[in-house]
Amino acid sequence: MNADREHQCDVLVIGSGAAGLSLALQVAQYGKVIVLSKGPRSEGATFYAQGGIAAVFDESDSIESHVQDTLIAGAGICDEQTVRFIAEHAKECVQWLIDGGVPFDKEEDSDNDHPRYHLTREGGHSHRRILHAADATGMAMQTSLQDNAHNHPNITVLERHNALDLITEDKIGGDANKVVGAYVWNRNAEHVETIRAKFVVLATGGASKVYQYTSNPDVSSGDGIAMAWRAGCRVANLEFNQFHPTCLYHPEARNFLLTEALRGEGAYLRRPDGSRFMPDFDERAELAPRDIVARAIDFEMKRLGADCMYLDISHKPADFIEKHFPTIYSRLMDLGIDMTKEPIPIVPAAHYTCGGVMVNPQGQTDLKQLYAIGEVSYTGLHGANRMASNSLLECVVYAWSASQDIIAQLPNASMPESLPAWDESQVTCSDEEVVLQHNWHELRLFMWDYMGIVRTNKRLERAMRRIQLLQQETHEYYSNFRVSNNLLEMRNLLQVAELMVRCAMQRKESRGLHYTLDYPDQLAESGPTILVPEK
């Protein structure tokens, strides 16, 4: 094999957000790590996370309270053992971030020897327990983790490298249930490379790009879920896609999120005529969980035929708004919206994939040597609805847990033998990229219409028929033409879209983020929706 097309490492981490970099930094003391980043390192979802990270730092708060709030938000199908595991390890994992240089906001009267962090409150939380860095927590975390990874001699970050597929050991005459590496598309050189590794970690994020309106960056195309499924891993709860209630409605600002902390600090949701509507839907009003708020906004928009609703914090002092929400204030001013004086136009947008690849408390999947952490995984934490600021927490707790498991096994793990090169001998360069673009837009539009905030059996059946048609076209395309970024993402999004719809079809009730007009009630007993790939 061409030497520059084959790499090897102790641990291959696919994804460079909070989960991937946190794990890489912890295992790099014990072995060589390669981290793959689809685009520039700051392009993932972590960078755009505004709100914060939940952990019990206040004496009036308790781990039990964090557990109970999470279980309530998850609408009865969280895994309580997982919820407890994460809540109990939250403080030490957040402290690891602080020790690594993440500049969480402190109280004004705090001193360096005994820092007191400014804690905010968001929907579903009964106490103030959200640590944050102004309104750009994800950016602060990502920047700190990136700098630490960049300076670590045992970590190599390969930017603009997309994983195509996992390689199982049966490719070299071994165990089909053991992962030994991955085929990777080098977007700079435009060729496929092979990376073999003792352990592979999926930290690829979610799949919200499957929807027309999303708060996520362009890289959120479900790659890890699709690759794990093709390799033989079970997935769960993919019917539960969280729609963030408040994404800015503006032609020049696609996917700009307006953090939940705005409502936590007193912002109201209003109709175009200025009247509030959340008290009509839930006694918690604007502080109700996201699924309830998103559905209320969707209902009011459809009822009134309105393009958007409005988020209004202008009744708060201007200096309070500018201090607590500097990023949002600045961005809105650039767009001609002064949030200290006028309401902000908003719509719901696909935001977070609550289901994913099934893992145990150490992040292990069904395949040996393969781990999944962060949004790509299904741990049981989120149940039918994710509570605000639990996602960054899940990233760092599972990064820690998986890293400990990998570190314990590294001394006895052997490097896989040389792997077969990617075969491009039967394919040609594409002359029909326009076909992919057309299929791409079609998929995102019908997923929004048929698999969106409100569903029916008929809508799900229509979505599945169209997915199968597009899968057939994309399979032919994949068989005949060389790899491209659009082709890889289209193939993966179609796979994940199919799994989402299959999960939704299996759930004969409305629960949390899954709301269907054909089964509007919640069953007395329920559990996760689990899909098993055919061997």
From Swiss-Prot:
What EC number(s) does this enzyme carry? 1.4.3.16
Which sites are catalytic?
290 (proton donor/acceptor)
Q: In which pathway does it act?
A: Cofactor biosynthesis; NAD(+) biosynthesis; iminoaspartate from L-aspartate (oxidase route): step 1/1
Enumerate the residues marked as the site Important in orienting the L-aspartate substrate: 122
Q: Which SUPFAM superfamilies match?
A: FAD/NAD(P)-binding domain, Succinate dehydrogenase/fumarate reductase flavoprotein C-terminal domain, Succinate dehydrogenase/fumarate reductase flavoprotein, catalytic domain
Q: Which GO terms describe its biological process?
A: 'de novo' NAD biosynthetic process from L-aspartate
Query: Can you list the GO cellular component terms from the UniProt entry?
Result: cytoplasm
Gene3D superfamilies from the UniProt entry = FAD/NAD(P)-binding domain, Fumarate reductase/succinate dehydrogenase flavoprotein-like, C-terminal domain, Succinate dehydrogenase/fumarate reductase flavoprotein, catalytic domain
For the protein in the UniProt heading, the enzyme class is oxidoreductase
What does the entry comment about cofactor binding? Binds 1 FAD per subunit.
Q: From the UniProt record, list the coiled-coil ranges.
A: none
Q: Which family is annotated?
A: Belongs to the FAD-dependent oxidoreductase 2 family. NadB subfamily.
Q: What name has this protein been given in UniProt?
A: L-aspartate oxidase
Q: What is the lineage of its organism?
A: Bacteria, Pseudomonadati, Pseudomonadota, Gammaproteobacteria, Vibrionales
Gene name, Swiss-Prot/TrEMBL: nadB
